[in-house]
Swiss-Prot record:
InterPro entries: DEAD/DEAH_box_helicase_dom, Helicase_ATP-bd, Helicase_C-like, P-loop_NTPase, RNA-helicase_DEAD-box_CS, RNA_helicase_DEAD_Q_motif
Organism: Sus scrofa
Region Disordered: start-end pairs: 1-241, 702-722
GO biological-process terms attached to the record: cell differentiation; gamete generation; germ cell development; male meiosis I; male meiotic nuclear division; piRNA processing; spermatogenesis; transposable element silencing by piRNA-mediated DNA methylation
GO molecular function, one term: ATP binding
Name by which UniProt lists this protein: Probable ATP-dependent RNA helicase DDX4
């Protein structure tokens, strides 16, 4: 028997053939290398030359590894279609067509006569369903009666075995479900609400080993909201299906109330100046007792180790309790999360809650939105801590996890919803929550939430049906940086009489962080980093780079040099991101190489060092990065590599940040700052502009120079924030 005699090699009476690929031929849940195969024009040729080509290669007529060419349905009715291992099948991409085959035979690895094939319709066989390994589905039709399986060796959207002969239409979802011997029976077609339209999908990853494994996101006959362009939630609507379900956090009381140890400089917070602008601001409080919180909240505050208010808490808590809108700007690690959670919980405990697990539609009273998955999960853990033992239930939803898991968490009862923008809009689009009861809308890292990355999503949110107007809800914004442009954008979200709280130097770095700048060329950075890390030893260190590829490259390099390192960035699966943070948090890997996805809000204990391997493009991002150390009165150190060829635009704002934080400024940096003309100290095309006071005062003192943070990030290197 010849090597290429495929038909004779397969015995239809034995168990299904499961091919074994080399380890690197399969990339897990993200699909495999076959799914990314692009076909040449000859591979997509249905004519005789195309067939002869593949017969010479050992494949039977009309088979290829390439992609099935896209065409209109009338071109498909009398022709066989080039597919994967058989007609109508493919390991690669397939174009847009309704896949109707009126004539011709579509065989897989073997032929099988059947009485079910009537009217010259095609049975679909092959490796994956679009046919299982043995049989495909009986009927194929456009619209909702699409073939039931679209699958794989393992049965994703179909299966390896026999496809269903009589697919069943799901009347609720407008989908036809097809089974398989090992099939999942999951829907193959999606209804957009009228029951007649098939939601076509194409592109990479449909069919092949392990199959599509995608999740169909549709509306319910109403508007279906799309997620943000930065890619955080796009996996819910295209590409491989997200199946990851994060493990639940520990439920024991000791784990819930595990808290950050305050540092030696915590008492210095009392000396920080605070400015409140706006009319009729309530007076600040000095102790938690003055807030008149309920006993349960006071007990939880004590268990969490809170004994003294930070400046942002002294001013923000009474303002929120008074029902005023607030924009608060305070340095990193100064307790902003507790500043808005405690008064919101106090109101809920006093006024009662509306959402419960016994209601069909959950209507949370509070929505908290943050730009990154890690930050929103951190806020949720704080909300769970302070609401312990109360009737208030906090829920967290974010991208990179199974959508069904998010929905299940919500339907069990949701009073406080912590979410990333993309997943939040998906849940709203699916009408899994109602917005009519919203009393509090909180934007954490608000400058990032309102810039060009997330601004459109936030505008969609406040214009959603049922969302109370800004006059009927309380809107709160918190961040360490509030550029002038962001303050102007915020007026669309806040009442006109909102209060502005500025704690210390707005946009300035924490003085508990010792900053050092080293002049290092691009090609000398790796060796310098290695030298520093070897001197540091096992002290916990975060290394920031600008691109996702470089994060993995540097992490691999350090591991090769026997330094335990992990990485986190937007291209890593959520499971991998959480594993990396866990390894770093618990000391398994003392070095974490990260991109901007980890720059904001992350509160990891005992981070002693931050190294800017690449300086960011904006000075406010620099402030957020170095704010991962020196938190809650603890001291830390930040080292930045300054490249003369790429970082000159940061010289002037960097000098200003160092000076304001009472740090030593290197002579070479001052020379660059004052010899380089950047129209930004007088208005720049690069850099950042901070407002040290409320912009409603008519004028503001600029702390640093540069370009507005509303500038769009580099689309090549931008993070998948959500």
């Amino acid at each position: 028997m010849g090597d290429e005699d495929w038909e004779a090699e397969i015995n239809p009476h034995v168990s299904s053939y499961v091919p074994i690929f080399e380890k690197d031929g399969y990339s897990g849940e993200n699909g495999d290398k076959f799914n990314r195969t692009t076909a040449s024009s000859s591979e997509m040729d249905d004519g005789p030359s195309g067939r002869d080509h593949f017969m010479k290669s050992g494949f039977t007529s009309g088979r290829s590894y390439g992609k099935r060419d896209a065409g209109e349905s009338n071109k498909r009715e009398n022709t066989s279609t080039t597919g994967g291992f058989g007609v109508g099948k493919s390991f690669g991409n397939r174009g847009f067509s309704n896949n109707r085959f009126e004539d011709g035979d579509s065989s897989g690895f073997w032929r099988e006569s059947t009485n079910d094939c009537e009217d010259n319709t095609t049975r679909n066989r092959g490796f994956s369903k679009r046919g299982g390994s043995r049989d495909g589905n009986k009927s194929e039709a456009s619209g909702p009666f699409r073939r039931g399986g679209r699958g794989s060796f393992r049965g994703c959207r179909g299966g390896f075995g026999l496809g269903s002969q009589n697919s069943e239409l799901d009347p609720d979802q407008g989908m036809q479900r097809g089974g398989g011997l090992f099939g999942s029976g999951r829907p193959a077609a999606s209804d957009t609400g009228n029951g007649d339209t098939y939601q076509s999908r194409s592109g990479r990853g449909r069919g092949g080993y392990k199959g599509l494994n995608e999740e169909v996101v549709t509306g319910s006959g109403k508007n279906s909201w799309k997620s943000e362009a930065e890619g955080g939630e796009s996996s819910d609507t295209q590409g491989p299906k997200v199946t990851y379900i994060p493990p639940p956090p520990p439920e024991d009381e000791d784990s819930i109330f595990a808290h950050y140890q305050t540092g030696i400089n915590f008492d210095k917070y009392d000396t920080i100046l605070v400015e409140v602008s706006g009319h009729d601001a309530p007076p600040a409080i000095l102790t938690f007792e003055e807030a008149n919180l309920c006993q349960t909240l006071n007990n939880n505050i004590a268990k969490a180790g809170y004994t003294k208010l930070t400046p942002v808490q002294k001013y923000s808590i009474p303002i929120i309790l008074a029902g005023r809108d607030l924009m608060a700007c305070a340095q990193t690690g100064s307790g902003k999360t507790a500043a808005f959670l405690l008064p919101i919980l106090a109101h809920m405990m006093h006024d009662g809650i509306t959402a419960s697990r016994f209601k069909e539609l959950q209507e949370p009273e509070c929505i908290i939105v943050a730009p990154t998955r890690e930050l929103v999960n951190q806020i949720y853990l704080e909300a769970r801590k302070f609401s312990f033992g109360t009737c208030v239930r906090a829920v967290v939803i974010y991208g990179g996890t199974q959508l069904g898991h998010s929905i299940r968490q919500i339907v069990q009862g949701c009073n406080i919803l912590c979410a990333t923008p993309g997943r939040l809009m998906d849940i709203i689009g699916k009408e899994k929550i109602g917005l009519k009861q919203i009393k509090y809308l909180v934007l954490d890292e608000a400058d990032r939430m309102l810039d060009m990355g997330f601004g459109p999503e936030m505008k969609k949110l406040i214009s959603c049906p049922g969302m109370p107007s800004k006059e009927q809800r309380q809107t709160l914004m918190f961040s360490a940086t509030f550029p002038e442009e962001i303050q102007r954008l915020a007026a669309e979200f806040l009442k006109s009489n909102y209060l502005f709280v500025a704690v210390g130097q707005v946009g300035g770095a924490c003085r508990d962080v010792q900053q050092a700048d080293l002049q290092v060329g691009q090609y000398s950075k790796r060796e310098k980093l290695l030298e520093i890390l070897r001197n540091i030893g096992d002290e916990r260190t975060m290394v920031f780079v600008e691109t996702k590829k470089k994060a993995d490259f540097i992490a691999t390099f350090l591991c090769q040099e026997k330094i335990s390192t992990t990485s986190i960035h937007g291209d890593r699966e959520q499971r991998e991101r959480e594993q990396a943070l866990g390894d770093f948090r618990f000391g398994k890997c003392p070095v974490l190489v990260a991109t901007s996805v980890a720059a904001r809000g992350l509160d990891i204990e005992n981070v002693q060092h931050v190294i800017n391997f690449d300086l960011p493009s904006t000075i406010d991002e620099y402030v957020h990065r170095i704010g991962r150390t020196g938190r809650c009165g603890n001291t830390g150190r930040a080292i930045s590599f300054f490249d003369l060829e790429s970082d000159n635009h940061l010289a002037q704002p960097l000098v200003k940040v160092l000076t304001d934080a009472q740090q030593d400024v290197p002579a070479w940096l001052e020379e660059i700052a004052f010899s380089t003309y950047i129209p930004g100290f007088s208005g720049s095309t690069r850099g950042n502009v901070f407002a040290s006071v409320d912009t409603r005062k008519g004028k503001s003192t600029l702390n640093t120079a540069g370009f507005s943070s509303s500038q769009a990030p580099n689309p090549v290197d931008d993070e998948s924030w959500d």
